[in-house]
Amino acid sequence: MKKWIVSAAVSMALSAVVAVHAEEAKNAPAADNPVKVEMRLLNDAFKNLLVSLILNNPGAIEEPFHEVHRAKANTEKALEKGEIKLPKNSNKMKEFIHMDEQFHGKLEALIEASRKGDMKAVQDVTHKLLNGCVQCHNKFRN
């Protein structure tokens, strides 16, 4: 019963997020920039991560992050070609790249913890990742 209540609460909260995300996706240009594509996949992976944490299901955490990793390769190619323009502080591209590399390193730690079933470590890394999201968005996103 307790799991059902938690699942219902999580579903309701995520429904609101999904509705906003769906609206953004409708308004996204067809040839969206790779950073935005990666961020949307990361958003989906994070929603799954939170549900997996709440339901104590470490086995469900890893898979969505593989899509994020594949998208990162496209982002890196676009960065190398100079095709990425940051909405804010675009003159600090090296710092953006450094923060991104640190973030993806933490994602690897998250996956390792989930493979071991260490949900305390998953929770700790999740907090660090979320802090990284907020810092990066504050610095580089409008």
Residue spans of the language-model regions?
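Positively charged n-region of N-terminal signal peptides that target proteins for export
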Residues: 1-4
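Bacterial N-terminal signal peptides
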Residues: 7-16
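Sec/Tat signal peptide C-region and signal peptidase I cleavage site
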Residues: 17-22
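Extracytoplasmic c-type cytochrome modules immediately beyond a signal peptide or single-pass transmembrane anchor
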Residues: 23-128
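The canonical Cys-X-X-Cys-His
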Residues: 129-141
